């Protein structure tokens, strides 16, 4: 077993060394050869040792393959030939100036050469041409121009520095004035529409109040009362904790006389259609203490005549009583505390038609 471990250790070390050697060899192989190692580098080195100059191919203009021409040495203070005049062409050939020794900036030769180099200058004369007339982009139609026709006047091109004619100024003033008027009209439009809507809403509210007041005057004193009882079964009572959620689900709202009312609007607005009271005296509810409240039954009652359609209101009251009885496991009775039936329903409908 120990021999096997030793063999494996040796093989692993050999493999690691082989991987390292192969990695170094790959890196060495991928590196570019330097100029010294290249064949051309040896060629240039041998030529330099022998003292021989490397032949260069020069074209007809005096430039070699690298674009370098012959070196021209110019002495300090030497003037340029007369045929060499500076021009504005940026593509002129530039000559390399080699000096034997650096010049001082304060030397007289440098100043003379600087003056000679600054003498030729390019003078560009600015030629002012008349600016062409711009087309008229005004939004006004050409009707106004046709109405004020007059003698034809030759149109002159505007010159730089001249003033704009007075007619253009008046036209721009008219356009600005009309734009300001339109902006004022647009600003005033929402205010006028809001004022109109407010007046319209006030008129609608006044009309509704007038209709309601007229309906109250027409109803007069109640002539009959339709009553339905929702009573607990024998030996049981109705708990307030169960009654209150049912009242709210049936869209009843606590209000006048400390009882719950069903209004024209499900949100509790408008006239009262019918109401719910406690069957036991004093017949009121206390919403803050409904959890401690219990009773034997509740009473649904609707006065005749009533607001709206009496048949529809009675149908809603009957359905509400049945839903409440089903939710709390109670019984629906009529005004005489007798079981509700078809005969009692026909009697109630006859009473509604008689007081319509």
From Swiss-Prot:
Transmembrane spans: 7-27
Membrane topology designation: Single-pass type I membrane protein
Entries under Pfam families matching the protein: ZipA_C
Residue spans, topological domain Cytoplasmic: 28-356
Source superkingdom: Bacteria
Cellular component, GO annotation: cell division site; plasma membrane
Sequence segments annotated as region (Disordered): 132-155
Localization per Swiss-Prot or TrEMBL: Cell inner membrane
Disulfide-bonded cysteines: none
UniProt record, GO biological process: division septum assembly; FtsZ-dependent cytokinesis
Record keyword Ubl conjugation present: no
Keyword annotations: Cell cycle, Cell division, Cell inner membrane, Cell membrane, Membrane, Transmembrane, Transmembrane helix
Topological domains annotated Periplasmic: 1-6
Xref: HAMAP family: ZipA (MF_00509)
Assembly, per entry: Interacts with FtsZ via their C-terminal domains.
Biological function: Essential cell division protein that stabilizes the FtsZ protofilaments by cross-linking them and that serves as a cytoplasmic membrane anchor for the Z ring. Also required for the recruitment to the septal ring of downstream cell division proteins.
PANTHER family: CELL DIVISION PROTEIN ZIPA
Family statement: Belongs to the ZipA family.
Protein known as: Cell division protein ZipA
Organism: Shewanella baltica (strain OS185)
Lineage: Bacteria, Pseudomonadati, Pseudomonadota, Gammaproteobacteria, Alteromonadales
């Amino acid at each position: 077993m120990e021999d096997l471990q030793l063999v494996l250790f040796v093989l692993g070390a050999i493999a690691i060394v082989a991987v390292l050697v192969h990695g170094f060899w790959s890196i060495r192989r991928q590196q570019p050869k330097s100029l010294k190692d290249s064949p051309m580098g040896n060629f240039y080195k041998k030529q330099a040792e022998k003292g021989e100059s490397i032949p260069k191919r020069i074209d007809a203009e005096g430039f070699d393959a690298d674009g370098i021409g012959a070196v021209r040495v110019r002495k300090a203070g030497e003037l340029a030939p007369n045929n060499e005049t500076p021009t504005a062409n940026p593509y002129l050939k530039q000559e390399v100036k080699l000096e034997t020794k650096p010049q001082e900036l304060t030397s007289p030769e440098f100043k003379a050469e600087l003056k000679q180099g600054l003498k030729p200058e390019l003078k560009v004369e600015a030629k002012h041409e008349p600016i062409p007339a711009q087309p008229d982009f005004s939004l006004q139609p050409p009707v106004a121009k046709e109405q004020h026709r007059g003698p034809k006047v030759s149109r002159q091109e505007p010159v730089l520095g001249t003033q704009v004619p007075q007619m253009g100024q008046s036209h721009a003033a008219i356009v600005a004035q009309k734009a300001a008027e339109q902006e004022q009209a647009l600003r005033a439009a929402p205010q006028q529409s809001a004022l109109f809507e407010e007046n319209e809403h006030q008129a609608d509210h006044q009309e509704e109040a007038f209709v309601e007041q007229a309906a109250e005057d027409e109803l007069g004193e109640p002539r009959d009362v339709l009553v339905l009882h929702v009573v607990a079964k024998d030996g049981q009572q109705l708990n307030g904790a169960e009654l209150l959620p049912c009242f709210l689900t049936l869209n009843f709202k606590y209000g006048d006389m400390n009882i719950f009312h069903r209004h024209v609007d499900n949100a509790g607005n408008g006239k009262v259609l019918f109401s719910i009271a406690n069957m036991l005296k004093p017949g009121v509810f206390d919403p803050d203490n409904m959890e401690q409240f219990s009773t034997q039954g509740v009473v649904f009652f609707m006065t005749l005549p009533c607001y709206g359609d009496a048949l529809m209101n009675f149908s809603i009251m009957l359905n509400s009583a049945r839903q409440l009885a089903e939710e709390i496991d109670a019984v629906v009775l009529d005004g005489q505390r007798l079981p509700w039936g078809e005969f009692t329903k026909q009697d109630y409908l006859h009473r509604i038609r008689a007081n319509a």
